[in-house]
């Protein structure tokens, strides 16, 4: 591919459409987070003015529960000095930099993230437009790579700073290009492999790579006069090898503490999280999650070698908890465990940095179970993020599933809530256990469009126990966190209601599939049904009241706008929350 061909997706027409789509989201989410305060105009439109008061943006919007703004993209216009100007997302952020709290230091990096997000949208606009009715009948990975929006709340949600255009085309999930991972041999003096109960290193690696590939890799080491027994194998994102390890870890390579063995044989597809790969050659094999020193949505996407040591133990602990709890088991909940992990510790960088430094997160990997072997006849898989996916005609994937199922919208929603929400509620009330249950972290098991059960993933890095008195095994202790009492329920109110149900409810209502009041009534009924089935937790239900009239508005974009390179202080995650006023609880009246 020539340099010119690599940017063929960047045309004036697609750039204009991408800018309009991004401004629609920016106006909606910044109004939701009260960064901007659109004022009503006599003609029924809304207006937002730039910091200088001279530039204005006008648009129409529908307002839903949870102060959700659904902005009509085609209605947005930009005005200055009595004339209309072309839409430009970059100009928008410069014109409202003070309103958005963008510092001189953060602004250019944020603009780079916005530019990257726009470029990604341009590429997506070149892809064949697949109606959601067709997508609803597609396979697991066709749905995964068919997602177009990314995180529904974050405006700059496809920054991926560090990727050049050739990297984007090779590794972005939406390009759906097959990837072969690079494998390194890492000397055991600095590397460690940990695994769940009953897993041995040799048999596990043989199962993932195959005997022939392992023998080939061992042969490369022997040719260099090295003993394969002294090394552990680590899968590496190709970008990480070419751009980081081959340079930043040059001393390790030169001294044969790291040996590049080349690519493996299996082909993988990048998932929405960009650093996790699904094995398309053998779908029953494990996902591989790799370290990737790329800045995306407020964090460098590395993997801590130190954290990898406890990862399998945390997963085994949670899997046992789910297996032994009759309520969780009755919902069909399962987790796909991170069964094994490997990490490499660069001792010199460790001596020079604190434990949260990106330099300690450059070389590690984990293997996560595939959900494919657990499928029963007639079942299929879809990322939960797909529910809020909307096609070019404005139709949602959720609506397509409802139609496909033959159920009424309320019946379909009840099944989904039992599979997804009930386990979250029970984990919270029975164990003070919380997840990061956004759309990309949950896989839905479907049968003829109906949700049968949910699969939670990304366990070790995302779950937390908020009970200071909980008895945890020593290896699991790191998931205990201190959270102020008055913010504990935000794990449901923010992560579930505001960051996912808000979008799903508004979209289904906008399509005329299910009225907003009916949506939230069904959620309330689902909560009541769970509470009535677990009367032994009545005191906890009173202590943490899901039917409280209002709850704090926790703002995600404000975190990124404040510091887009380290969005949350990892030493005090709850202390980083940006709480701005309150939202009316949509289930309080039921």
Task: Give the label of every model feature segment.
Residues 432-445:
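A short glycine-rich, hydrophobically flanked beta-strand micro-motif that places a catalytic Asp/Glu
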Residues 1-419, 446-590:
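Nucleotide/phosphate-binding site architecture used for ATP/NTP-dependent chemistry
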């Amino acid at each position: 591919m020539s340099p010119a061909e690599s940017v063929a997706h960047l045309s004036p027409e697609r750039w204009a459409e991408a800018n309009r789509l991004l401004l629609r989201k920016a106006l909606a989410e910044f109004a939701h987070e009260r960064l901007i305060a659109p004022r009503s105009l006599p003609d029924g439109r809304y207006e937002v003015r730039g910091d200088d008061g001279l530039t204005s943006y006008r648009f129409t919007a529908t307002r839903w529960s949870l102060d959700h703004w659904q902005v009509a993209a085609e209605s947005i216009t930009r005005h200055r000095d009595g004339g209309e100007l072309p839409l430009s997302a970059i100009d928008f952020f410069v014109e409202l930099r003070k309103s958005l709290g963008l510092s001189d230091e953060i602004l250019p990096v944020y603009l780079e993230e916005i530019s990257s997000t726009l470029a990604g949208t341009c590429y997506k606009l070149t892809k064949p437009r697949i109606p959601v009715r067709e997508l609803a009948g597609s396979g697991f990975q066709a749905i995964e790579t068919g997602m177009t929006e990314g995180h529904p709340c974050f405006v700059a949600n496809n920054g991926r700073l560090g990727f050049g255009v050739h990297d984007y085309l090779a590794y972005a999930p939406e390009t759906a290009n097959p990837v072969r991972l690079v494998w390194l041999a890492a000397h055991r003096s600095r590397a460690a492999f940990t695994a769940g109960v009953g897993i041995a290193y040799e048999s596990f690696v043989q199962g993932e790579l195959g005997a022939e590939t392992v023998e080939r890799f061992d042969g490369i080491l022997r040719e260099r006069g090295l003993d394969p027994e002294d090394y552990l194998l680590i899968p590496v994102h190709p970008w990480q090898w070419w751009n980081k390890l081959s340079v930043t870890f040059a001393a390790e390579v030169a001294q044969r503490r790291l040996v590049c063995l080349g690519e493996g044989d299996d082909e993988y597809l990048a998932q929405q999280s960009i650093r996790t790969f699904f094995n398309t050659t053998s779908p029953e094999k494990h996902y591989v999650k790799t370290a990737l020193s790329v800045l995306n949505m407020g964090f460098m996407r590395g993997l801590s070698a130190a954290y990898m040591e406890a990862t399998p133990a945390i997963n085994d602990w949670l899997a046992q908890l789910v297996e032994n709890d009759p309520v969780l088991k009755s919902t069909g909940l399962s987790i796909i465990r991170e069964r094994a992990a490997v990490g490499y510790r660069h001792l010199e960088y460790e001596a020079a940095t604190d434990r949260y430094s990106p330099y300690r997160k450059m070389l590690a990997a984990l293997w996560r179970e595939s959900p494919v072997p657990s499928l029963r006849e007639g079942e299929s898989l879809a990322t939960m993020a797909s529910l809020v996916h909307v096609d070019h005609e404005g139709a949602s994937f959720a609506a397509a599933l409802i139609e496909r199922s033959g159920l009424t919208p309320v019946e379909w929603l009840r099944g989904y809530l039992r599979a997804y929400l009930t386990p979250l509620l029970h984990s919270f009330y029975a164990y003070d256990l919380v997840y990061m249950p956004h759309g990309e972290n949950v896989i839905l098991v479907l049968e003829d469009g109906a949700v049968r059960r949910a699969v939670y993933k990304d366990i070790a890095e995302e779950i937390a126990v908020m009970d200071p008195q909980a008895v945890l095994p020593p290896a699991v202790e790191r998931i205990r966190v201190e959270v102020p009492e008055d913010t504990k329920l935000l794990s449901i109110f923010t992560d579930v209601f505001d960051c996912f149900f808000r979008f799903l409810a508004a979209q289904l209502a906008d399509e005329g599939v299910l009225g907003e009041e009916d949506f939230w009534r069904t959620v309330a009924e689902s909560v009541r049904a769970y509470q009535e089935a677990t009367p032994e937790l009545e005191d906890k239900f009173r202590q943490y009241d899901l039917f409280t009239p209002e709850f704090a508005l926790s703002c995600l974009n404000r975190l990124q706008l404040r510091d887009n390179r380290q969005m949350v202080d990892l030493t005090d995650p709850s202390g980083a929350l940006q709480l701005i006023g309150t939202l009316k609880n949509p289930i309080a009246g039921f």
